Amino acid sequence: MVSQPTTSSGPQFECETGNYHTFCPISCVAWLYQKIEDSFFLVIGTKTCGYFLQNAMGVMIFAEPRYAMAELEEGDVNAKLNAYDELQRLCLQVKKDRNPSVIVWIGTCTTEIIKMDLEGIAPKLEDEIGIPIVVARANGLDYAFTQGEDTVLAAMASRCPAPQEVRSEEEKKERTGGLRTLFSHGKKDEKKAGPAPSEYVDHQPLVLFGSLTDPVVNQLTLELKKQGIRVSGWLPAPRYTELPIVEQGVTYVAGVNPFLSRTASALQRRMRCNLITTPFPIGPDGTRGWIEAICQALGVIPKGLDEREQQIWDALRDDVEFLKGRSVFFMGDNLLEVSMARFLIRCGMIVHEVGIPYMDKRYQQAELELLDRTCRELGHPPVRIVEKPDNYNQIQRIYACKPDLVITGMAHANPLEARGITTKWSVEFTFAMIHGFTNAHDMLKMVRKPLDRNNALKSLGWEKLIQEV
């Protein structure tokens, strides 16, 4: 284990030598193919990847989803078959059957090991078939669970058009006006109703990046609208043809998830955008910090955030009272751990350890500062953050500190439950709506569920969920 020097008041960083004990990053296909409606995802891997996708997303197979598996065979691995010809055949078939606006190739562990030159093949094939091909490497050797989305969005960031590349005003409106069209549905025509005062202040264009469900996108966009901030677009957009316009040196960008560090780097370095370093909008405190950081960067004075945050805390009073004084241990899986730990500390919980597969301190700087401030305000000891934790050592620490709840990946949940340790799957927080003011209750409800179950079992005279034989 390697310890890194920190101030006495800040988080204590350590790094162990464990592997990525996380869900496979190619699972990002599950939500991205639904988010980008005119896309097609082609996962290039072995039978193992196919089995994983069938198990993870098998319920969707009868709906003819917009993803497929390009299964590598022995001839591909030993280079007897021409990779270009095989991918050309598959992409032409996809074009004929679905005619998507973009095809996304997802590289896996096998394509990484045999050094398949997907980035070299894609531009030639793109010119030939006339459909953009985006290459994203989401192999489990180099990336943790949610970083699959990060690699896809980082690859798509370079496809965002500059203002001079958008030819017509109609296309410009299509790329910037999708959300406003949705919000104005059912309202009177502004031309007929007469001119209305502008709801927005004058500021530089803002693009938000991160894949969230449409209701959460609408909520966060409306929260910024209350501050007079117009969101120019989201990455990913609902359609590939609606990717946001990015102007070098002018456009500001902000992330909504802590695992999008490569996307942030791509937008900042390749596209020359101005990155706003923010806490992440998880919990009322994080959402307020996210809005305040964006307002400060754009020169907008925030208003009404004290009342808005207090309103949410009042609604969460019962959950906070239940969780206060209880302890939690994060084993590490989805890279949301630091933001979740900060919110749970604010709710009065004790966090023994935050395990995390990968930590980008520059991208999460504002989140770490908010975590430190939260600990100091509530008298919580400095949080121990362990990067790439070793599971054997973690289990010894769990036995030593005896937490009320362990938030862990699915692989470890049942073995820990069999040893009398209460667990919650971290993957549930990835797929649930936990961002923004109004969804804070849903996250606390998920944290409460296994603890409520224990109370119910005790009322029946059971001490553990799994009975020893």
UniProtKB/Swiss-Prot annotation:
Pfam families xrefs: Oxidored_nitro
Recorded metabolic or biological pathway in which this protein acts: Porphyrin-containing compound metabolism; chlorophyll biosynthesis (light-independent)
GO molecular function: 4 iron, 4 sulfur cluster binding; ATP binding; metal ion binding; oxidoreductase activity, acting on iron-sulfur proteins as donors; oxidoreductase activity, acting on the CH-CH group of donors, iron-sulfur protein as acceptor
Record key words, sorted: 4Fe-4S, ATP-binding, Chlorophyll biosynthesis, Iron, Iron-sulfur, Metal-binding, Nucleotide-binding, Oxidoreductase, Photosynthesis
GO BP annotations listed: light-independent chlorophyll biosynthetic process; photosynthesis, dark reaction
Coiled coil: none
Enzyme Commission code(s) on record: 1.3.7.7
Cofactor: [4Fe-4S] cluster
UniProt-listed HAMAP family: ChlN_BchN
NCBIfam families with a match to the protein in the record: DPOR_bchN (TIGR01279), PRK02842.1 (NF002768)
Function recorded in the entry: Component of the dark-operative protochlorophyllide reductase (DPOR) that uses Mg-ATP and reduced ferredoxin to reduce ring D of protochlorophyllide (Pchlide) to form chlorophyllide a (Chlide). This reaction is light-independent. The NB-protein (ChlN-ChlB) is the catalytic component of the complex.
Assigned protein family: Belongs to the BchN/ChlN family.
Name of this chain's protein: Light-independent protochlorophyllide reductase subunit N
Organism: Gloeobacter violaceus (strain ATCC 29082 / PCC 7421)
Protein encoded by which gene: chlN
